Amino acid sequence: MRVALFPGSFDPVTWGHIDLVKRASLIFDKVIVLVANNSAKNYLLSDVERYELTFEVIASLGWSKIFVDRYDGIILDYALKNDIGFIVRGVRAFHDFEFEFERYVVNNKLSPLVDTIFLPSSDRYLFVRSDLVKELIKNKNFDLSSFIPELVQKKLKSKFIDKLS
């Protein structure tokens, strides 16, 4: 069975993430969406909230080959511990590729057992970023349905509109 890992912070999960996960599921037998923590980032949502929201969104789509997990550690370590041979990384533009390629080189030096697959973002999601969504959610009048699922928009607005205004 060909299993792939799609890691990210998902703060929050966007249509861009979902598109990449769906496309990865066409290539692999199983895809694990891994909600990970990066100590260099400041999160709007807690790790539990990010996991639960990502899980709810994926579950609502009914895709049987896609699973959600969370991990607080090195992504390569998770892949090795769980016998996962591939890490899928989305690439929006050249700066994403440069960053992800450096990560690939390091991972490959540490363990050639796990390979990295780069998927370019679909045109319609090239400029969809979680940090952009967090900035836009401050204005409750914006319709963010082209960036995030309605479930995510409702959750963010109900939870954070008072804190962010």
UniProtKB/Swiss-Prot annotation:
Protein name (database record): Phosphopantetheine adenylyltransferase
Function, in words:
Reversibly transfers an adenylyl group from ATP to 4'-phosphopantetheine, yielding dephospho-CoA (dPCoA) and pyrophosphate.
Alphabetically list the UniProt keywords.
ATP-binding, Coenzyme A biosynthesis, Cytoplasm, Magnesium, Nucleotide-binding, Nucleotidyltransferase, Transferase
Taxonomic lineage of the native organism: Bacteria, Pseudomonadati, Spirochaetota, Spirochaetia, Spirochaetales
Q: Does the keyword NAD apply?
A: no
Q: Where does substrate bind?
A: S9, K41, I75, R89
- Where are the residues marked Transition state stabilizer as a site? H17
Organism, as annotated: Borrelia hermsii (strain HS1 / DAH)
Which EC number(s) are documented for this chain? 2.7.7.3
List the gene name.
coaD
